[in-house]
Regions:
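Conserved active-site tyrosine of GNAT-family acetyltransferases
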Residues: 19-24, 82, 113, 163, ...
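Flexible internal linker/loop segments at domain or repeat junctions
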Residues: 189, 197-210
Length: 300
């Protein structure tokens, strides 16, 4: 395994002001002061220069998922393995690498059409989080093992078998567990990077119009989750799922729809795993309790 963490997301928004207000006032992220020649805006949650790059466009979709490698050697090996397997790997320019605050990156698409940006050498500026909503800390680090990434993302993977092989044999992730939820023909494969977070990426075996099923950010306690839930209600935003706790990663969370419809899970108490002692599991139930799902326009 060579992927260290899921480092950032590039999100296209039809209303960047609304997305930035959601990110800061509701989620409690901090807007970066960075200026971007392409007009992108940035949300940060820790000492990284950004975790979410918000770019203007007609549709609300995930543009790319940034996966970090621990060294140039690991990154080069992954790129070489992908090319040898017949995947088109596109190195990014130095200018584009600087926009992402990385030493180097390359783009590749998985067999289900999701765009990845593989990179190494993230450039930190160590500006501390100053959350406009008063969030004290987002869980992005483990004191013993270092960076765990911003949280996790669940990507659509209708070409499920080939996409699993792509991530496990070429990209450098490993399967944490497998879920067959009580929904016809549904499956979710959870994958971890080389850090203790129970999953950094997951694959859902159906297509999704926004290019991402949901993204997750984690805070340090239940009170932070409760205060965020209050902010969601005050903002009049639709809940996708009520408060609940998952079976696999133990996350106590709720789900909210961001402006434009991308789902965000907001939780705490996520499981951290010693992978040398872990055996992947198969489940048929996703929640210990709660998480009553409501899909706007469907459950109305």
């Amino acid at each position: 395994m060579t992927v260290a963490a899921i480092g950032y997301l590039r999100i296209q928004a039809s209303d960047t002001d609304a997305w930035m207000n959601f990110g800061t006032a509701v989620l409690g992220l901090m807007e970066s002061a960075r200026q971007d020649a392409g007009g992108a805006r940035f949300l940060r949650m820790d000492d990284h220069p950004f975790r979410f790059m918000i770019e203007a466009g007609e549709q609300d979709v995930l543009l790319a998922t940034g996966l970090e490698y621990r060294s140039a050697a690991h990154w080069q090996a992954a790129c070489a393995a992908l090319e040898a397997a017949g995947h088109a790997v596109s190195p990014g320019s130095q200018e584009e690498a600087e926009r992402r605050c990385v030493e180097a990156y390359a783009s590749v698409s998985d067999p289900s059409g999701n765009t990845l940006e593989l990179y190494h050498g993230r450039k930190l500026d160590y500006v501390p989080l100053n959350s406009p909503a008063g969030v004290k800390r987002f869980i992005t680090r483990d004191e013993r093992n270092g960076d765990m990434g911003f949280g996790h993302a669940v990507l659509p993977a209708p070409e499920t078998g080939a996409t699993i092989v792509f991530y496990t044999e070429l990209i450098g992730l490993a399967v944490s567990d497998d879920l067959y939820p009580p929904i016809p023909d549904s499956r979710v494969i959870f994958m971890h990077a080389d850090n203790p977070r129970q999953h950094s990426l997951a694959l859902y075996n159906q297509p999704h119009p926004s290019g991402v099923v949901h993204i997750m950010v984690e805070v340090e306690n239940l009170d932070e989750v409760g205060r965020a839930l209050d902010r969601v209600k005050q903002a009049g935003l639709p809940l996708l799922a009520t408060l609940g706790r998952h079976v696999n990663d133990n996350m106590c969370s709720f789900y909210v729809l961001a402006p434009g419809g991308i789902a965000v899970e907001y939780g705490y108490d996520g499981l951290q795993v010693d992978w040398e002692r872990h055996t992947p599991t198969v489940s048929t139930e996703g929640d210990l309790w709660g998480h009553e799902y409501s899909f706007p326009g469907v459950n109305d």
